[in-house]
């Protein structure tokens, strides 16, 4: 990967893909292929991370798979190898989300001294089919003014 710009120098991003490990998210089927939400969210997260790094940002990839990188296949095979920075991912949703927040908070406590801008980006794919059968896309931005940590409430 080649850095093409320093536009994001001094920025640090925590990129988190949805589901993973024991939770594949929703599973769809196209012909003989199963489509698992977590595999596509992970692939998109890696592509985003690469693009941020090319612009000079530091990127921490929170959900990781030791074997799968960016894949150019139309259909991505499922695995349950994903970890949360080396730790097994719990099946329980609240525990899974808290684990991710804990990892980000620990990294942020170290990184905030070295970077002028730190943000977490969560990638989640919702494959629920609706009546109009169109894909929806949402961006949720959380602004923290006084809280020291991200929290699950």
Placement of each model-derived feature along the sequence:
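Catalytic-site microenvironment of enzymes
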Residues: 1-153
């Amino acid at each position: 990967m080649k850095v093409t710009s320093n536009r994001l120098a001094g920025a640090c991003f925590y990129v988190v893909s949805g589901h993973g490990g024991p939770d594949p998210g929703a599973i769809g089927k196209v012909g003989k292929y199963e489509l698992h939400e977590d595999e596509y969210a992970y692939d998109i997260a890696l592509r985003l991370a690469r693009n941020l790094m090319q612009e000079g940002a530091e990127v921490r990839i929170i959900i990781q798979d030791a074997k799968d990188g960016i894949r150019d296949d139309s259909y991505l095979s499922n695995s349950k190898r994903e970890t949360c920075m080396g730790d097994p991912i719990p099946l329980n949703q609240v525990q899974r989300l808290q684990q991710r927040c804990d990892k980000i908070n620990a990294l942020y406590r170290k990184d905030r001294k070295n970077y002028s801008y730190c943000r977490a980006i969560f990638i989640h794919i919702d494959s629920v089919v609706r009546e109009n059968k169109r894909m929806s896309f949402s961006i949720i931005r959380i602004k923290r003014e006084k809280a020291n940590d991200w929290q699950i409430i």
